[in-house]
């Protein structure tokens, strides 16, 4: 039985000052290894010896690797994801000034006390240096797979090694554990060669190595921020949502990566005389999907169109999906030459996307969140897609079934547990969010994979902080949150002004948000005391979060009603695009009560604008939908969310 007990260490539990400031809680996880994972050379053979966590249940598996080169490059890509951090790091001297104060304060201490003070300072000021949970490895009846999550909460990766890639050892022990993926192990992996016999060995104690001068068990504790664990669970759980799938050839992705490597994210046009300097160009990638045609990849801001060669899109609905995090695709560069095909799974514009590389018996899944931990506005809207609560009995029943069968499709699990398909799906999604289960995007099945040895307290991962919890409470109360004005400014973004009446405070708050086309907050203001004191330095206040939540929910309702109840719509904006030899025509239709504004022109050029005013909202609505129907008949794609 596992002795691992995730707890909140003393001094790291949530605290409030004046009822508003929150210190980020962390989960302490105890790890112990019977030896350091390494590559052991023995004559003409090499063994990738991975020691599991002794504080978790015994796990054992492995065998002779049939294709060492693909195995080497797949593990190297996994290591690149572990080390990746795409967050912006500004120049500041905070760490240096803190270090000088520490040095002065510890001048009179002996060596041991000084080292302890330095480690304590690192844990307080650089928590990510200690925060990474070691990679997870699971031995299942059909494959051995590894899972990792990046520092910036933006990239998730899973490497699946099918049993056909091995000459498997006898008597495996199925289960999940952690492994220590150190730089020394990575260096040893780089020395694997195709002409040298290579073996994989995963075990807690049974990896036979000769060690001298090291303790019997290597113990370490990591203090993982709950936000990081929450991001891991949510991005992995996103695979359970409805997805649009299409296929790429490896050369298609290579063309994307080549262009990104040769071009920086800078504006492509200079300012005209007498005009202001243009803003930085977009950093997204648009994917144009038309049934019966090959998908097209469009790189912003250069508007470079990369046609794909793996076949036509087999979906039934034409659409344009805009995704972010495209430079994270460079994490696949080492495995790309060995890939046979690439399946792309899209959830929608600005939402997580998954890239499944199939390289023989190896399958590498890269999940991109579409945002980093700093982009709270996009993260909050993503939270609405996953269920908040579910029947705990159904979740336990599903988890108990998978603990025996190890994996299964949603249909097979529903049949085995006697639950309805809807109940099964919700229970599986909640199980993934709680860290008990995981969804294998590559195989479209669910697996039993406890993230930690001891169950995680799911209530601590439901919200990022107390302000987000309060924001959800505000939105749950009818009539408390209202949108006073909603203005979509062409080329700028969405401008929101809200009105929030809090009876407990006997006050009315007026939050304002400007969200650009990439989902980032460009401007935020609120009349509350928390915002006046901290601005956005301590994160958004509960009223800004509530406004963003309310707008996202209203947008979901509008999209669900699109094409069903046109007679009730009084405010809506749609964008349509159609590509031709000269470029791409873009139309934007904005209905606002009695007013209809139309913008059209070639993408990247100044648009023509026409404003129409009507005697009634009904007349404006009729004119709006007449133009919508006309554009769709002419073959324009709905790019409203892109």
Question: Where are the predicted features?
Answer:
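Long, low-complexity, compositionally biased intrinsically disordered regions
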Residues: 2-642
């Amino acid at each position: 039985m596992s002795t691992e007990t995730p707890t909140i260490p003393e001094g790291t539990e949530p605290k409030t000052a004046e009822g508003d400031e929150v210190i980020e809680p962390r989960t302490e996880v105890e790890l112990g290894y019977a030896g350091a994972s390494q590559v052991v050379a023995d004559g003409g053979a090499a063994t990738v010896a991975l020691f599991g966590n002794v504080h978790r249940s015994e796990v054992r598996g492995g065998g002779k690797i049939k294709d060492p080169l693909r195995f080497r490059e797949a593990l190297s890509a996994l290591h690149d994801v572990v080390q990746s951090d795409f967050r912006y790091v500004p120049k500041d001297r905070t760490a240096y000034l803190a270090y000088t104060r520490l040095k002065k304060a510890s001048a009179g201490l002996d060596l041991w006390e000084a080292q302890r003070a330095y480690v304590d300072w690192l844990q307080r000021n650089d928590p990510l240096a200690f925060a990474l949970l070691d990679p997870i490895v699971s031995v299942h009846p059909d494959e051995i797979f590894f899972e990792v999550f990046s520092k910036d909460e933006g990239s998730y990766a899973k490497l699946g090694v099918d049993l056909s890639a091995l000459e498997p050892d006898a008597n495996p022990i199925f289960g999940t554990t952690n492994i220590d993926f150190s730089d020394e192990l990575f260096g040893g992996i780089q020395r694997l060669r195709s002409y040298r016999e290579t073996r994989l060995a995963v075990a807690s104690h049974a990896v036979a190595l000769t060690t001298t001068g090291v303790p019997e068990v290597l113990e370490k504790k990591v203090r993982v921020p709950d936000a990081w664990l929450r991001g891991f669970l949510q991005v992995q759980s996103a695979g359970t949502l409805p997805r649009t799938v299409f296929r790429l050839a490896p050369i298609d992705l290579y063309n994307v990566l080549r262009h990104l490597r040769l071009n920086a994210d800078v504006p492509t046009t200079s300012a005209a005389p007498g005009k202001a300097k243009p803003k930085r160009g977009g950093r997204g990638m648009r994917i144009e999907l038309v049934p019966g045609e090959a998908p097209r990849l469009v790189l912003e801001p250069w508007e470079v169109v990369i046609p794909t060669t793996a076949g036509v899109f087999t979906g039934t609905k034409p659409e344009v999906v805009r995704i972010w995090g495209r430079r994270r695709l460079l994490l696949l560069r080492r495995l790309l030459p060995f890939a046979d095909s690439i399946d792309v799974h899209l959830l929608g514009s600005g939402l997580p996307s998954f890239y499944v590389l199939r390289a023989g018996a190896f399958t590498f899944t890269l999940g991109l969140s579409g945002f980093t931990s700093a982009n709270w506005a996009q993260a909050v809207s993503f939270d609405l897609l996953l269920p908040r609560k579910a029947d705990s009995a159904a979740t336990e029943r599903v988890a108990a079934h998978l603990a025996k069968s190890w994996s299964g499709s949603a249909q097979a699990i529903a049949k085995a547990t006697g639950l309805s398909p809807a109940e099964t799906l919700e229970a599986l999604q909640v199980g993934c969010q709680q860290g008990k289960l995981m969804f294998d995007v590559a195989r479209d099945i669910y697996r039993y994979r406890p993230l930690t040895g001891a169950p995680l307290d799911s209530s601590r991962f439901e919200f990022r902080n107390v302000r987000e919890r309060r924001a959800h409470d505000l939105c749950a109360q009818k009539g408390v949150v209202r949108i006073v004005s909603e203005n979509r400014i062409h080329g700028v973004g969405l401008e929101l002004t809200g009105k929030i009446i809090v009876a407990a405070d006997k006050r009315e708050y007026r939050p304002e948000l400007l969200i650009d086309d990439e989902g980032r907050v460009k401007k935020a203001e609120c009349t509350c005391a928390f915002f006046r004191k901290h601005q956005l330095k301590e994160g958004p206040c509960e009223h800004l979060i509530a406004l963003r939540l309310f707008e996202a929910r209203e947008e979901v309702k509008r999209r669900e009603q699109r094409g069903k109840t046109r007679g009730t719509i009084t405010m809506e904006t749609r964008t349509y695009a159609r590509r031709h030899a000269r470029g791409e025509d873009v139309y934007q239709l904005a209905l606002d009560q009695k007013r209809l504004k139309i913008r059209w022109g070639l993408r990247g050029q100044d648009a023509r604008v026409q404003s129409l005013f009507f005697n009634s909202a009904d007349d404006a609505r009729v004119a709006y939908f007449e133009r919508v129907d006309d554009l769709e008949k002419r073959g324009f794609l709905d790019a409203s969310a892109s």
